[in-house]
Amino acid sequence: MAIISSKKQSPQPERPDDDIFLASENQVSYKYKTKKSKSQAQRSEVEALLEPEASAAEKSDNQNEEKIRPQRLDEYIGQKDLKEVLNIAISAAKSRKESLDHLLLYGPPGLGKTTMSLILAAEMEVNCKITTAPAIEKPRDIVGLLVGLQKGDILFIDEIHRLSKMTEEILYPAMEDFRLDITVGQGKSSKTRSIPLKPFTLVGATTKVGSLTSPLRDRFGIIQRLRFYEVDELSLIIIRAAKVLNTDITEDGAEEVARRSRGTPRIANRLLRRVRDYSEVKKLTPINAEIAGEALELFNVDPLGLDWTDRNLLRTMIENYNGGPAGLETMAAATGEDAQTIEEVYEPYLMQIGFMQRTPRGRVVTAAGWRHLGFSPPDEQLSLKL
């Protein structure tokens, strides 16, 4: 659910024993009760949230994952424009001895938003706490995170568009003025005061930047989009990962995996592991283009990176709706897939490669999409601009 990286964490500051009511800029109050543990050595509820126990297998997987992740900005492959912007921001913050400005990263999943937050922490030599918006269920969850941050620390919140309104309102003064607005007590005897926070950097990640409220979005000083990767960039990522995994792969083998990776490093690393398994079991080394192609065909990944679900989505639209237009909910009902999954996972890549288009009346399969599945497109699909 969350990771703490880099430096050793200092103990969280003591909180008052009183019932605390958190007040936003609009003076909306939320109750926050502190709970005393049986002993000071016992983890708090927030610490348990941030540092879950991992099994030996999970620890091994995490170690491999950490080795594959680039550790520094100059090791990060691709996203040239983003790296230039962040390099300037890092240099400026270091020269002024300030924390980085708040950063919002948006784009399809798997493009390296979490990795970039860890790199920023490494470059700034600070801690990085990672969590997701759905894990922040109550005001005390975000309060625990904020008060535990040391000077310059980075707080990474994935799926930030899913934050509740009350959590957002707590973040407003925290992001802008590095303070928590709280009200102690209830009724006429209540008193409002501000608790200072140490300067920190909030890094938010989202696949739906349009779903963020304007007050939250406007508090980010840097807003950057992550794009899909080119084949040559993914090839370099795959070759680097193969070295970490002690897997012998040729340049054309890496390129074959890259072509089928949907422009996404996370998928590239996953497919590399499947190809490695195939190579080891079949005793076929080094992994060249032919071996990689055979392995990925076995796992139902075609030369353009489409899997069974992608092809089923296109085929259903062609066979049932003559290629569209069809609404998102109609597509979900016809294929049995979740509408949000179609919109966030499958549709962006199908649109990226020109197999699907959005129109005012719904989604439409393009002529290229028809041909990829072996169908002859009707005249109306031929007229669509690709």
UniProtKB/Swiss-Prot annotation:
First-listed, main subcellular location of the protein, grouped into a coarse class: cytoplasm
Keywords tagged on the record: ATP-binding, Cytoplasm, DNA damage, DNA recombination, DNA repair, DNA-binding, Hydrolase, Nucleotide-binding
Catalytic activity: ATP + H2O = ADP + phosphate + H(+)
Gene3D superfamilies in the record: 1.10.8.60, P-loop containing nucleotide triphosphate hydrolases, Winged helix-like DNA-binding domain superfamily/Winged helix DNA-binding domain
Family matches, as SUPFAM superfamilies: P-loop containing nucleoside triphosphate hydrolases (SSF52540), Winged helix' DNA-binding domain (SSF46785)
Signal peptide coordinates: none
Residues involved in ATP binding: I68, R69, G110, K113, T114, T115, E176, D177, F178, R219, Y229, R266
Residues binding Mg(2+), per UniProt: T114
Enzyme Commission identifier(s): 3.6.4.-
InterPro entries cross-referenced by the UniProt entry: AAA+_ATPase (IPR003593), AAA_lid_4 (IPR041445), DNA_helicase_Holl-junc_RuvB (IPR004605), P-loop_NTPase (IPR027417), RuvB-like_N (IPR008824), RuvB_C (IPR008823), WH-like_DNA-bd_sf (IPR036388), WH_DNA-bd_sf (IPR036390)
Residues covered by region (Disordered): 1-70
Origin: domain of life: Bacteria
Region entry Head domain (RuvB-H), spans: 303-386
Residue stretches of biased makeup (Basic and acidic residues): 56-70
Residues noted as binding DNA in the record, renumbered to the chain: R358, R363
Annotated region described as Small ATPAse domain (RuvB-S), given as residue ranges: 230-300
Annotated spans, Large ATPase domain (RuvB-L): 13-229
GO BP term, example: DNA recombination
Subcellular location: Cytoplasm
GO cellular component, one term: cytoplasm
Gene Ontology molecular functions: ATP binding; ATP hydrolysis activity; four-way junction DNA binding; four-way junction helicase activity
Biological function: The RuvA-RuvB-RuvC complex processes Holliday junction (HJ) DNA during genetic recombination and DNA repair, while the RuvA-RuvB complex plays an important role in the rescue of blocked DNA replication forks via replication fork reversal (RFR). RuvA specifically binds to HJ cruciform DNA, conferring on it an open structure. The RuvB hexamer acts as an ATP-dependent pump, pulling dsDNA into and through the RuvAB complex. RuvB forms 2 homohexamers on either side of HJ DNA bound by 1 or 2 RuvA tetramers; 4 subunits per hexamer contact DNA at a time.
Domain comment (free text): Has 3 domains, the large (RuvB-L) and small ATPase (RuvB-S) domains and the C-terminal head (RuvB-H) domain. The head domain binds DNA, while the ATPase domains jointly bind ATP, ADP or are empty depending on the state of the subunit in the translocation cycle. During a single DNA translocation step the structure of each domain remains the same, but their relative positions change.
Family: Belongs to the RuvB family.
Binding partners and assembly: Homohexamer. Forms an RuvA(8)-RuvB(12)-Holliday junction (HJ) complex. HJ DNA is sandwiched between 2 RuvA tetramers; dsDNA enters through RuvA and exits via RuvB. An RuvB hexamer assembles on each DNA strand where it exits the tetramer. Each RuvB hexamer is contacted by two RuvA subunits (via domain III) on 2 adjacent RuvB subunits; this complex drives branch migration. In the full resolvosome a probable DNA-RuvA(4)-RuvB(12)-RuvC(2) complex forms which resolves the HJ.
Protein name: Holliday junction branch migration complex subunit RuvB
Organism: Trichodesmium erythraeum (strain IMS101)
Upper classification of the organism: Bacteria, Bacillati, Cyanobacteriota, Cyanophyceae, Oscillatoriophycideae
